[in-house]
């Protein structure tokens, strides 16, 4: 049986009739997109070579499995195209913003197809999401046992990656001993309510540690169709000032990482409304094309790439001063 919607037309079978891809073995380096000491060229091309740090960054990439003709519910991380997308899209343009703050770890995982967030396919979503989180949870547990060695931890993600990261925070940090090692959690691209993560609370100072930041970016004066359901009421951090400032001009913006690999400063001004960041059209090459785009979800990280890079280093420095002084 094929499940086809008039609007979305995703070719798919019921979850129960679809083969589940092989699980990653995190003892095998091939199950990691990024490990310290063996950064891929895609990452090095943006950040340069890394130096060892007493802070680690555990990054979970967003939904990259989106093809409407792909009938799978979960990604096969061994597929060449999937591995390439992770490196050339998310690692290069997203994970790179945290590279100067710590040692980067990015596990491959059997992420859920985008359709699991679209009606009527979302009815099968929970079964698919469970597989995705099983992988991320196992990857993080493996990281803790074999790599962490008492280092500070930055948890970062985007979109589906932030959904996975939220669950990590609940399971491994909230009221747990590991909470003392949490530098910060960066959770853009998904709604996070103030008390959703228990003792891990929102941060409203640029040097604060031990909490989380989150935001969702949209074109100025525009609202998503599902605003009430997916955005309203979420914590909305100002990712330029990192405080409770609700309007920030272009002059304070440190930089957007564009698809050409260049950073453009003073590119956007923002305004915070309930659950959203409203952004001006970025002043970057080919900006005319962006003037027709309402949702900047795809650029939640890229738009504030340099701002994140600088802030993550500040929070890492603060944590190190408190925990690693001799």
Model-inferred region functions:
Residues 53-55, 100-104, 149-152, 179-183:
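Loop/turn elements at helix/coil->beta-strand transitions in domains of secreted/extracellular proteins
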Residues 137-149, 171-318, 322-326:
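Surface cap/lid and interfacial helix-loop subdomains adjacent to catalytic sites
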């Amino acid at each position: 049986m094929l499940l086809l919607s008039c609007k979305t037309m995703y070719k798919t079978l019921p979850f129960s009739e679809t083969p589940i891809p092989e699980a990653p073995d995190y003892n095998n380096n091939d199950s990691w997109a990024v490990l310290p000491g063996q950064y891929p060229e895609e990452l090095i091309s943006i950040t340069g070579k890394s130096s060892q740090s007493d802070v680690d960054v555990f990054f979970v990439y967003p939904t990259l499995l989106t093809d409407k003709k792909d009938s799978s519910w979960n990604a096969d991380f061994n597929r060449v195209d999937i591995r390439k997308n992770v490196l050339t899209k998310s690692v290069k343009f997203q994970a790179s913003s945290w590279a100067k703050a710590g040692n980067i770890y990015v596990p491959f995982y059997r992420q859920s197809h985008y359709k699991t967030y679209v009606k009527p396919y979302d009815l099968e979503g929970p079964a698919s999401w469970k597989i995705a989180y099983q992988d991320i949870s196992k990857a993080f547990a493996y990281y803790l046992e074999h790599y962490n060695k008492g280092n500070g931890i930055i948890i970062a993600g985007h979109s589906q990656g932030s959904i996975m990261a939220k669950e990590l925070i609940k399971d491994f940090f909230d009221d747990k001993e590991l909470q003392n090692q949490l530098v910060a959690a960066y959770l853009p691209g998904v709604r996070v309510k103030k008390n959703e993560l228990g003792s891990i609370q929102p941060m409203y100072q640029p040097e604060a540690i031990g909490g989380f930041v989150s935001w969702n970016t949209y074109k100025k004066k525009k609202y998503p169709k599902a605003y009430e359901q997916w955005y309203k009421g979420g914590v909305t951090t100002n990712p330029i000032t990192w405080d409770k400032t609700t309007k920030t001009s272009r002059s304070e913006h440190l930089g957007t990482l564009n698809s050409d690999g260049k950073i453009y400063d003073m590119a956007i001004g923002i305004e915070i409304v309930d659950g959203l960041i409203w952004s001006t059209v970025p002043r970057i090459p080919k900006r005319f094309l962006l003037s027709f785009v309402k949702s900047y979800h795809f650029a939640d990280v890229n738009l504030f790439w340099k701002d994140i890079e600088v802030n993550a280093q500040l929070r890492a420095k603060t944590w190190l001063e408190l925990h690693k002084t001799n």
